[in-house]
């Protein structure tokens, strides 16, 4: 599995700001969008382009535009919604697929409760977004659903990842790509990433 930790100074700075204990909901949302945007920039670096001729202000001009498979953005509910706008800044025509999965706090296992995936997902590149890759259970379950629908081009974008989650994801889906703003130290006994960001969903939705 290709794992990319984006070490751009802007990314490192913004993730650092997100770690503040008393960060406001407004600021956390803004930063989640901004970092999601920067991760999208990295994750799409290998997208193919084609040369076309258009009518410019002073006559015909040759430009490059994206070609090949179109994109579906797949936020994992609910926290993944906090990164979605950052992806759509670069890919405004992307279709949106939604997967609802929550983590059982006792077993730490993923529990699916909702899915609405575009009908032609097998023809698209899926960008799966979720702020935290902790145990990896929710991401693995989401990718399982996408593959069952025939999707073969999948990239996962997360703000923070734990080594344990990366290992689990690689074992389950070695053919995908993972882009993260930070690989943190470890998980604690409750399955939270250390140093992490806290509960990203609560911070995005103001329910902390």
Swiss-Prot record:
Its cofactor is Mg(2+). Belongs to the UPRTase family. Allosterically activated by GTP. Pathway: Pyrimidine metabolism; UMP biosynthesis via salvage pathway; UMP from uracil: step 1/1. 5-phospho-alpha-D-ribose 1-diphosphate binds at residues 78, 103, 130-138, 199. Keywords: Allosteric enzyme, Glycosyltransferase, GTP-binding, Magnesium, Nucleotide-binding, Transferase. SUPFAM superfamilies: PRTase-like (SSF53271). One of its GO terms (biological process) is uracil salvage. Its EC number is 2.4.2.9. NCBIfam families: PRK00129.1, upp. The keyword Nucleotide-binding applies. It comes from the Bacteria. Uracil binds at residues 193, 198-200. Catalyzes the conversion of uracil and 5-phospho-alpha-D-ribose 1-diphosphate (PRPP) to UMP and diphosphate. Binds 1 Mg(2+) ion per subunit. The magnesium is bound as Mg-PRPP. This is Uracil phosphoribosyltransferase. The keyword Kinase does not apply. It catalyses: UMP + diphosphate = 5-phospho-alpha-D-ribose 1-diphosphate + uracil. GO terms for molecular function: GTP binding; magnesium ion binding; uracil phosphoribosyltransferase activity. Pfam families: UPRTase.
